[in-house]
Amino acid sequence: MTLPAGWEGADHNFLGIDEPWCHPEQAGVYVLPAPYEHTSSYILGSDRGPSAILEASAQVEFYDEQLGCEPFREWGGIATATTLDLQGSVDGQAVDAIQAFVAPHVGTGKFLVTLTGEHTGALGAIRAHAARYPELCVVQIDAHGDLESSR
């Protein structure tokens, strides 16, 4: 089974899984890498997060002892889209590009995971979902807790 354009094989797929488990027609999970960084104010590099996550994921064990299975098989596989090129895109342009990247997959029955960089990148994915699901509630998981009290 040949992968369609816009999708990655085992070399760049989440977990490094091979066909047929990384094929988008079969997979129940889509990973959509959209690296973006423009408003970071301290240490730069959040735009490298999606590629670092994909690279590190190849070291993850497939078998989950608590579940007693290889979850990606239970889900039909995990397909990873080719990374969205956001070079030269700033703020609204990047948000619009990410929204356009994610929108075609919303409502398809796939579980979508969008890997961005900084906080702004999530807005495009959220807008894509909110356009289809107006009552959407968002829980955003950040790299840190942001639990420091205001001074």
Region roles according to the model:
Residues 2-151:
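Conserved alpha-helical scaffold segments that buttress catalytic/binding sites
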